Amino acid sequence: MDTIKSFKGYGKVNELEQQAYEKKTRKRLIIIAVSSIVLIAVIIAAVAGVVIHNRNSESSPSSDSVPQTELSPAASLKAVCDTTRYPSSCFSSISSLPESNTTDPELLFKLSLRVAIDELSSFPSKLRANAEQDARLQKAIDVCSSVFGDALDRLNDSISALGTVAGRIASSASVSNVETWLSAALTDQDTCLDAVGELNSTAARGALQEIETAMRNSTEFASNSLAIVTKILGLLSRFETPIHHRRLLGFPEWLGAAERRLLEEKNNDSTPDAVVAKDGSGQFKTIGEALKLVKKKSEERFSVYVKEGRYVENIDLDKNTWNVMIYGDGKDKTFVVGSRNFMDGTPTFETATFAVKGKGFIAKDIGFVNNAGASKHQAVALRSGSDRSVFFRCSFDGFQDTLYAHSNRQFYRDCDITGTIDFIFGNAAVVFQSCKIMPRQPLPNQFNTITAQGKKDPNQNTGIIIQKSTITPFGNNLTAPTYLGRPWKDFSTTVIMQSDIGALLNPVGWMSWVPNVEPPTTIFYAEYQNSGPGADVSQRVKWAGYKPTITDRNAEEFTVQSFIQGPEWLPNAAVQFDSTL
């Protein structure tokens, strides 16, 4: 996330393109306003149809006397598509399918996913064939190939999550899952652009333009699917016609019986499946060796105990490595240490000392370190794209880009995080609770920005939330200007609440991605009930998208319960958490 070379900033927007976009946006707002009545009618009719169907099924085989709701498939599709950012591509891509002659909103959503999957599946063949002429560009293209595969998995998972029961609407839990996975799929595609865009070569600039053009359809189609699930299925799920009945007590519905028993047994870290020790007193001397035992796509928890020591190795748990728990003897005793960095030729995405994609990852009492140093610029200690991942009593030590909360739902509790520029960044739905966040002295003439949030689509359910934490200097030599963060993308979302902010903070609080360029009005940056000498908001930035205070009701939207659905899965990770304010 280099200040100058990064492609990611909103400041890179062409002025003419921005004017055209604003004109298009105004036109779309008018269209949406007009079509809202139609859309509401479609939704009411869809729910009415479901209710009629259910009542009819429960009464008698004959339904001749029950009035049926008649809808125009074309009108339904148009109303649905008018809620998306790209209504034209939504309508044209779905209406071309034979199955589109329907008014079922869930089927229309699945068709939108189908066109997104078809488009993304063909994308790898469109990647630049001569990338091998530039070694760094080839590494960036490799990142693209990896994240496209992840995005496809998210799209397929979204189809599976809604089930196959006809005439019923998805449950709110299913909708939340799908919103998360589609948000991640969009983030994956954006990560490709980031990897190529951070390079500063002629070949990279040409490749970036080529890839952006080739990705336009896949990005729009995925965005359309996300808008439909957020604005249509999300509303329908509030009616009492769920496709899967949600459990209100006990373990969350996504856990199987075997997984529940294992979690009950292993919550106390008493029965590890593997023990790692540098001195040879365990089964393995390296973490990597122990992780080779993990079965792919296993619903069973696999736990690894890592004894005190510094383990110099890079770990990458792929998307098919599920439900791994790794724990040590303490965040200041057991460390995983690496030194990969951007300056030596590694894409930021691949610099992580420890990277995890597979769902259900848990880390406890362990530290993650990237010791490349400030002069090496981007150097990630930990990157997580693991859905429902938990980090409890962990430490993350680095300089620029220390902690990459890339995508999906994540929770950090009682953790220590040090760094300089953008040292908590990414586009996950992530909550940091009761953590110690410690900016450190950067290179001369540099500044510190704690966060850089990467939300690029308004319907993504993502953001960085820091709650009940402390923000204090690391060491006693911090003199560099220090800020709570800077907006990385057009819809960046960051909330600092109920935290203690030290005197280290510059009174303006936040800074723009591009100096002297105000962020888009579409960002959401807010503070709520903070304390300490740095919590005074009287001199804060005056951006349209910044809120120096928000209501209790607004703040509730960013709690563990509302933002990451924590009560459904955190109790089984044996981690403390506050679900509300």
Curated annotation (Swiss-Prot):
InterPro entries: Invertase/methylesterase_inhib, Pectin_lyas_fold, Pectin_lyase_fold/virulence, Pectinesterase_Asp_AS, Pectinesterase_cat, Pectinesterase_inhib_dom, Pectinesterase_Tyr_AS. GO terms for molecular function: enzyme inhibitor activity; pectinesterase activity. Gene3D superfamilies: Invertase/pectin methylesterase inhibitor family protein, Single-stranded right-handed beta-helix, Pectin lyase-like. Residues 1-55 form the signal peptide. GO terms for cellular component: extracellular region. Substrate binds at residues 348, 378, 486, 488. It catalyses: [(1->4)-alpha-D-galacturonosyl methyl ester](n) + n H2O = [(1->4)-alpha-D-galacturonosyl](n) + n methanol + n H(+). Keywords: Aspartyl esterase, Cell wall, Cell wall biogenesis/degradation, Disulfide bond, Glycoprotein, Hydrolase, Secreted, Signal. May have roles in the deposition of pectin in developing tissues and in the wall loosening and cell separation that occurs in cell expansion, fruit ripening and abscission. NCBIfam families: PME_inhib (TIGR01614). This is Pectinesterase 3.
